Amino acid sequence: MIQIKNAKELDGMRKANALSAAALKYGGEHIEAGMTTWELDKLIYDFIVKHGGTPNFKGLYGFPGTACISLNDTVIHGIPSHDIIIRPGDIVSIDTGAKIDGFNGDNACTYAVGKVDLEAQRLLDVTKAALYKGIEQAVAGNRIGDIGYAVQSYCEDAGFSVVREFVGHGTGRELHEDPEVPNYGHQGRGPRLVPGMTIAIEPMICQYDCKISQSKDGWTVKTKDGGLAAHFEHSNAILKDHTEIMTRFWDDPDFDPEKFSLK
């Protein structure tokens, strides 16, 4: 069932997503070649806890980390590890969130470590742009399929492919709520968007074929062909006259997570 939030609940969602976005940007700014993904995860954990939140990924369905940290051909759900070292030229996806006062935030961004090749950079640019194409369609009166169509058509026109097995979702008191928000679809199909809905839109896009495989750890999802993958995500509130990007801080060049405060 789709949960419609009232004004007080929307304020709670804004707070949780502000912290989530600040933590994501903090993590992104501290990525360094030579560090392990476990070290990066610990930085994000400490940031969330310092600001009064709870890392909402940690322990969810048994996931061991504060963030899913996915490198190169890992699409999503990379487990932070002492054994995975970030290297120059990698692309690193961070997907993380915080819970505070009973509400959940969720967001993701894929970062380039130093200089990456032109095709890797194009994948990042297209996937990020596709996120905003989807958000443009996430307005009251439109349907879920309008979002998916916008993401899919933009990415496929650029020569990339869209993961089918994992999708965006509603957010709220639970991290994952109805409705599902696929990154593919048909215009005018699916549930209608109404004010008070809060949804996470998160394109997961592959450089080549969209076929994926899950590792033996039960979490890590990789491209089958070894091509790169990128993942970007914003949590959004559908309002009467516009849509609010609640996790906008991670993509604000003027936002300094070191100065972040919920007070």
Give each language-model segment a name.
Residues M1-K263:
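Active-site neighborhoods and metal-handling regions in enzymes and metal-associated proteins
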